[in-house]
Each structure stands twice: as C-alpha cells, then as structure tokens.
Amino acid sequence: MVKLYSKFPDVQVLTTKGPIDFYKDIFGKGKWLFLFAHPADFTPVCTTEFVAFSQKYEEFKKLGVELVGLSVDSIYSHIQWLMDIEQRYGVKVPFPVIADPDKKLARMLDALDEASGQTIRIVVLASPDGIIRFVAQYPMEFGRNIDELLRITKAAIVNYKAKVVLPANWQPGQDVIVPPPAIFDEAEMRIKLPNAKAWYLLFKKYEELPPDQKV
C-alpha cells in the first residue's frame, strides 16, 4: 500500500469532469485531495458509498477538500453508472471519477488487486503540498463510514495547520494536544502547566487556536 508521508503521484488523469492534473488543478490551488478507489461500477456496496459520499460532498468542499473517485472501469461505464445512480436514488454525483482502464494510477497507489484486476477499496488523503497524510484499505465486502472519514479529514487539517496532535475519539471543538518537548528542561517546565497531565501530555483548548487553524 502507498506509504504515509510520501508524495502523491504527479500524473494527469481522465475523469467524468474532464482531465485533471493533481498538482495544477488541486494542490496548485491550495486544496486537499481525498481520493477513494472502488472495486467496480454497478456493484451494490460501491453504489451505497457513492450515494453516501455525494451526500457529504458539500461538507468536504467547505474544508477545501476535493473528493475524487477511482476505478479501472472505462469513462463510459462511469458515466452510465452515475446516470443510473441519479435515476434510481435521486442523487447526482458531484465529484469527478477517474477512469483508469490501463491501471496506471491504481498500480502507482498499490491499489490494484492483480488477481481480480479490480481496484482495492482504499482511501488516500493528501495535503496541499502533495504529501499523503492518511491511507486506509477496506475489504471488498463492506463499505466505508463516511462520517468517520470526514472526522479523520478534519483531524488531519487541524494537525497540518496548527501543528498539534489529536487524542482518541477527537471531534472538532474538543481539546487538542501539544506535541511533547524533546529537551529535558522544557519537559520539567511543561509538567507545571495547568493543562498538563504529564510532561508528555499537555492539552490545549480548541478555542485557543487561531481561526485559520480550525475546521
């Protein structure tokens, strides 16, 4: 699987919204990339995921995040499937879907099941500098939790902007954690602070973050 903190591939792709150059059209505009691959068009689990992602599209957009789908199906298969989703479920898919029939991008992302020839159900989140900040892989048999992926995206953005870390089960608005010091004297001083549970665990109120570091 593609590695955390590695560079997202610098490639151009064909999508249902036209060609996309990741570094020009997304990262070059200061946006985050949330790429999710699905095994195949016209399949039950993937259909429910596309409906769910579409329903959360505006929330991702407000965060400055571009949702982009991916599979090895053809562009014509994608178009017909998106039409089918709109006709059957009343949901218009607002984000681009990459057609990767030659499997080039799928292989670059280690997102191809060579045995079946299908794309693996993965998620890749990359910051505006093109660095991959989150990667996850899911079984073919069940769908992703979009609310949890939205929470992870928000946590990644706060971490990236504010240089803080986030505790277990963190939700926007809750306390964040200041990274621990690597110098002994600073560690001794840290333990004396009111919000310090230990020298390595210092909480900070979310509202103390500057507005441009919040989500």
UniProtKB/Swiss-Prot annotation:
One of its GO terms (cellular component) is cytosol. Keywords: Antioxidant, Cytoplasm, Oxidoreductase, Peroxidase, Redox-active center. Residues 2-158 form the Thioredoxin domain. Its EC number is 1.11.1.24. It comes from the Archaea. Pfam families: 1-cysPrx_C, AhpC-TSA. Substrate binds at residue 121. It is found in: Cytoplasm. GO terms for biological process: cell redox homeostasis; cellular response to stress; hydrogen peroxide catabolic process; response to oxidative stress. The active site is at 46 (cysteine sulfenic acid (-soh) intermediate). It is an enzyme of class 1 (oxidoreductase). Thiol-specific peroxidase that catalyzes the reduction of hydrogen peroxide and organic hydroperoxides to water and alcohols, respectively. Plays a role in cell protection against oxidative stress by detoxifying peroxides. NCBIfam families: PRK13189.1, PRK13190.1. Belongs to the peroxiredoxin family. Prx6 subfamily. The active site is a conserved redox-active cysteine residue, the peroxidatic cysteine (C(P)), which makes the nucleophilic attack on the peroxide substrate. The peroxide oxidizes the C(P)-SH to cysteine sulfenic acid (C(P)-SOH), which then reacts with another cysteine residue, the resolving cysteine (C(R)), to form a disulfide bridge. The disulfide is subsequently reduced by an appropriate electron donor to complete the catalytic cycle. In this 1-Cys peroxiredoxin, no C(R) is present and C(P) instead forms a disulfide with a cysteine from another protein or with a small thiol molecule. Homodecamer. Pentamer of dimers that assemble into a ring structure. This is Peroxiredoxin 1. It comes from Sulfurisphaera tokodaii (strain DSM 16993 / JCM 10545 / NBRC 100140 / 7) (Sulfolobus tokodaii). The lineage of its organism: Archaea, Thermoproteota, Thermoprotei, Sulfolobales, Sulfolobaceae.
